[in-house]
Amino acid sequence: MLDRPNPAGRPIEGLTLRPGWESFVGAGPIPMRHGLTLGELGKWFVDHFKLDVDYHVIEIEGWKPDEGPGFGWPPERVWINPSPNAANLNMARAYAGTVMLEGTTLSEGRGTTRPLELFGAPDLEPRKIMAEMERFAPDWLAGCKLRDITFQPTFHKYVGEMCRGIFIHAEGRFYGHESFKPWRLQSLAFKAIRRLYPDYDLWRDFPYEYEFDKLAIDVINGSPLLREWVDDVSAEARDLDTLTDPDERDWHEQRRSYLLY
């Protein structure tokens, strides 16, 4: 395995995939943000699934994921899109949260020049949503800057319609590597929408990545726990932390022996 930097760096965040929820987008019990390189993660998969392979990692020379300003991605390193919808480092940092938009009726910005860095819909009120996010869980807004925007997708959801939404800036002077929590940030946006618009048709019900009997948002998260938290009118921010913190602590210990850098 020829290793390469993880542009999102070392932070860990999110729920661990539960048994029975394995899919094309979730092969094993790891959190949304695992904080490993491909080489390190491959070694974990070899051990976890007891694969009988001769596995060797060609290590990165001089990679220092804990050093700014680039952290996981050295500033001088050229960005080459791994996908048409992965246009830059800001997207890579936000993606652990914005990927969940694929399981919703909200546009994730496909059909714009900045997909997976923003979200919205024609009927949203972004300033109200940001105010509710600030009221409900202000700590989850750290390490980035949110900006209300309008955009018009040229394809995909809401093609040709003017959408109102929110752009996530996890870059420049706004970016805090340790404090930015994209998975909680996007979860918070869902929660704010549910609190402001209780009957909003948020979850997209369609076949997703070869899964026909499960909601896409649950497939992406490896369980229904996140969706259930969003839809529970009595659930507070601390309730999601109560679900997630043990998974994050366990992964922090579990991955320790696989770190090469």
Predicted segments, located by residue:
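Glycine-rich, charge-decorated loop segments at or immediately adjacent to ligand/cofactor-binding or catalytic sites
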Residues: 1-21
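Sec-exported extracytoplasmic/periplasmic mature domains
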Residues: 10, 46-50, 194, 198, ...
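Conserved anion/nucleotide-ligand pocket segment
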Residues: 21-98
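Glycine-rich, aromatic-lined ligand/substrate-binding cores of catalytic
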Residues: 63-158
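Conserved functional hotspot residues or short segments at active or partner-binding sites
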Residues: 120-241
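Flexible, low-complexity junctional segments that flank or bridge functional domains
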Residues: 245, 249-259
